[in-house]
């Protein structure tokens, strides 16, 4: 398969307790084998994926791929939607599951095995998805979500879990 589209792979090297960073050579080999035109960039700090997704959108990439877990996907969605709000054309979102939490990929039917995920990405199958936005609390400017949002007890558990050492 060859594809003339441009893919920006936003990879969180700390996803999956570092397994995402170790998977870079395999990802590169698989995407090359499928003939994809891609660039991989690694996140370096929290919310960097959102910044990289915004830039990839303004740079004109056709597909922006979140390579990580649910956190990387969420940040990437937020960056894409921010770029759309600024008047940019929205690229397609791709996901490579290399994190610990892959609920978004699971709910979308995206394979969580890396080779199958790369094959799915190369197949160029697309569908529209709903994106929600929550405004308030810690996010007065709003924050987007792709597969779920927690409020009340669920949100407290999420914030407390962030404090735990992994």
What are these regions (language model features)?
Residues 1-67, 74, 78, 115-116:
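ATP/NTP phosphate-donor binding region
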Residues 19, 41, 68, 109, ...:
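Catalytic cores of large soluble enzymes that bind and process phosphate-bearing ligands
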Residues 34, 58, 81-166:
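Catalytic core of DAGKc-family lipid kinases
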Residues 68-69, 99:
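A short acidic Gly-Thr/Ser loop motif
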């Amino acid at each position: 398969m060859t594809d003339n589209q441009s893919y920006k792979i936003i990879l969180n090297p700390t996803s999956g307790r570092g397994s995402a960073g170790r998977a870079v050579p395999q990802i590169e080999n698989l995407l090359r084998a499928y003939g994809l035109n891609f660039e991989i960039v690694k996140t370096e700090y929290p919310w960097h994926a959102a910044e990289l997704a915004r830039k990839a959108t303004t740079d004109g990439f056709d597909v922006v791929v979140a390579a990580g877990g649910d956190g990387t996907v969420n940040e990437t969605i937020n960056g894409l939607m921010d770029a759309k709000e600024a008047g940019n054309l929205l690229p397609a979102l791709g996901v490579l599951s290399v994190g610990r939490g892959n609920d978004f990929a699971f709910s979308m039917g995206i394979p969580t095995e890396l080779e199958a995920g790369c094959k799915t990405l190369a197949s160029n199958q697309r569908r529209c998805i709903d994106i929600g936005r929550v405004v308030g609390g810690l996010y007065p400017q709003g924050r987007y979500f792709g597969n779920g949002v927690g409020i009340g007890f669920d949100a407290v558990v999420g914030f407390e879990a962030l404090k735990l050492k992994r």
